[in-house]
């Protein structure tokens, strides 16, 4: 059990982690930007450190400042919450190098799952169903068009490094593919610094189903149930319903087993989410 944890976040998640630390009799240490000095998590804490000005890049994304505070305060772990540095592989590596536990997956796992084209291959090797599409990245718009012609339209162009709907385009007609591919690639380069793209068959009118998983680092992985995240705006979830009314007991069991297999294949440790697309015909990917 940890003795002292630095919470590298703000707002609701910082308060929730703070309360969890108190319940477990772990001493919480919080950080804040100059704009958040009156925030609730700061008011609750006995140890609170300013890590920079209001701009997130200079505070909550400032790896050196956060690690300096963690070491000075004698923290043996850092909880990143969500957003900010929670999926930053370099930060996870920096914590390990400093002898501080990063409460989350390792840097290698973050990198492996952060590249969606590589993650597709990993899931296929583990027997987890993936949406029909490219085997890895596609290098050119012409290659993407040839693949789309073979699997049939509509298709989905996706950025390997993408997220939040950026670097993604739906293509319904062959003549749309090349211009939309270049458009998606340009957006991906601007947003993520990578122009690597891949292609999938577009599942029309799907449900977005997630399974919560936990892995302890000793080979034990469990799933803790499902939630339906299909109500979205611009590819961002608005509401989650748990459990999903769309799943039969048999389908829920199969998807839960696939979620556990996916986490094992990735070598995932800690709490996490495995996301599925559920097609109208009951097939999941």
Predicted regions and their residues:
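N-terminal beta-alpha lobe that positions the nucleotide/phosphoryl donor
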Residues: 1-285
């Amino acid at each position: 059990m940890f003795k002292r944890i630095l919470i590298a976040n703000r707002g609701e998640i910082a308060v929730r982690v703070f309360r969890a630390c108190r319940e477990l009799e772990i001493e919480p240490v919080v950080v804040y930007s100059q704009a958040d000095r009156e925030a609730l998590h700061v008011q609750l804490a006995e140890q609170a450190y300013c890590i920079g000005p209001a701009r997130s890049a200079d505070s909550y994304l400032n790896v050196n400042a956060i690690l300096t505070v963690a070491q000075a305060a004698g923290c043996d772990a850092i909880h990143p919450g969500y957003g900010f540095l929670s999926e930053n592989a370099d930060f996870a590596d920096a914590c390990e190098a400093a002898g501080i536990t990063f409460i989350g997956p390792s840097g290698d796992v973050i990198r492996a799952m952060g590249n969606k084209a590589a993650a597709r291959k990993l899931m296929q090797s583990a027997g987890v169903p993936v949406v029909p599409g490219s085997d890895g990245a596609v290098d050119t718009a012409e290659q993407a068009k040839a693949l789309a012609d073979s699997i049939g339209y509509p298709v989905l162009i996706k950025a390997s490094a993408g997220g939040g709907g950026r670097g993604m385009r739906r293509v319904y007609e062959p003549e749309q593919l090349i211009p939309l591919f270049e458009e998606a690639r340009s957006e991906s380069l601007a947003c993520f610094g990578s122009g690597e793209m891949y292609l999938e068959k577009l599942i029309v009118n799907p449900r977005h189903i997630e399974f919560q998983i936990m892995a302890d680092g000793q080979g034990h992985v469990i799933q803790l149930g499902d939630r339906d995240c299909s109500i979205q705006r611009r590819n961002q979830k608005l509401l989650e319903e748990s459990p999903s009314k769309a799943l039969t007991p048999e389908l829920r069991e199969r998807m839960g087993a696939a979620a556990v297999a996916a986490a094992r294949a990735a070598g995932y440790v800690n709490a996490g989410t495995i996301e599925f697309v559920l097609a109208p015909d009951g097939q999941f990917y």
